UniProtKB/Swiss-Prot annotation:
Any coiled-coil regions, as ranges: none
Subunit structure: Toroid-shaped homodecamer, composed of two pentamers of five dimers.
Originating species: Ostertagia ostertagi (Brown stomach worm)
Pfam families reported for this sequence: GTP_cyclohydroI
UniProt name for this protein: GTP cyclohydrolase 1
EC number: 3.5.4.16
Keywords: Allosteric enzyme, GTP-binding, Hydrolase, Metal-binding, Nucleotide-binding, Tetrahydrobiopterin biosynthesis, Zinc
Gene3D superfamilies on file: 1.10.286.10, 3.30.1130.10
Binding site for Zn(2+): C104, H107, C175
GO molecular function, one term: GTP cyclohydrolase I activity
Recorded family membership: Belongs to the GTP cyclohydrolase I family.
InterPro entries: GTP-CH-I_C/QueF, GTP-CH-I_N, GTP_CycHdrlase_I, GTP_CycHdrlase_I_CS, GTP_CycHdrlase_I_dom
Catalytic activity entry: GTP + H2O = 7,8-dihydroneopterin 3'-triphosphate + formate + H(+)
């Protein structure tokens, strides 16, 4: 809480510090448990977790998994960080070829590809880098491509309340390459069209033509 002078009170500062300590303790506890779990997995596939090449693998794998899923710790407001600006521009804005990496929630193997985002502002625009950060936040979770596509589009609506949003993701799934049907060249495309992109075929067609130029 701020005092009359405008400075944070010692109680507020102490509370923030306590929350950071709790978050750090929880993360450390999670890391220890995940390290033990990876050690168990390695052992159960028939490997010796004590041999030189694998001694630090459980710890490395646990840290990597925490990084791959760091999106669970992020919120949209934190990502936006006040980068929403008043602007009268009312024509299409497109950021295409945003690289994306995620983990399939079914087999915990990667899928990666590119995200194309278009929107038509309604008196507000979003800092361009924030579109990439929105993609990063949702892709750094256990995902399916269909849900990821919709989450990105919904976040754009929450951020700037545009006249319309279009999101297309084109990705390759390692669960189709490394196992199962083992189709190396297969790609999956998903889309989410909201507002004018859903209601107006010409607007939708313009977006699709522009992202594939």
């Amino acid at each position: 809480m701020a005092s009359e002078s405008g400075f944070l009170s010692s109680d507020s500062s102490s509370e923030d510090c306590d929350q950071k300590i709790i978050a750090f303790s929880k993360k450390t506890s999670n890391l220890d448990k995940m390290t033990a779990a990876y050690s168990s997995i390695i052992s159960h596939v028939g490997e010796d977790v004590n041999r030189q090449g694998l001694l630090k693998t459980p710890d490395r794998a646990a840290k990597a998994m925490l990084y791959f899923t760091k999106g669970y710790e992020q919120q949209l407001d934190d990502i936006l960080n006040d980068a929403v600006f008043d602007e009268n521009h009312d024509e299409m804005v497109i950021v295409r070829d945003i690289e994306m990496f995620s983990l399939c929630e079914h087999h915990l193997v990667p899928f990666n590809g590119k995200v194309h985002i278009g929107y038509i502002p309604n008196k507000k625009v979003l800092g361009l880098s924030k579109l990439a950060r929105i993609v990063e936040m949702f892709s750094r979770r256990l995902q399916v491509q269909e849900r990821l596509t919709k989450q990105i589009a919904t976040a754009m609506v929450q951020a700037v309340q545009p006249a319309g949003v279009a999101v297309v993701i084109e990705a390759s799934h390692m669960c189709m390459v490394m196992r199962g049907v083992q189709k190396i060249n297969a790609t999956t495309s998903t889309s989410c069209m909201l507002g004018v992109f859903r209601d107006d075929p010409k607007t939708r067609e313009e977006f699709l033509n522009l992202i594939h130029k």
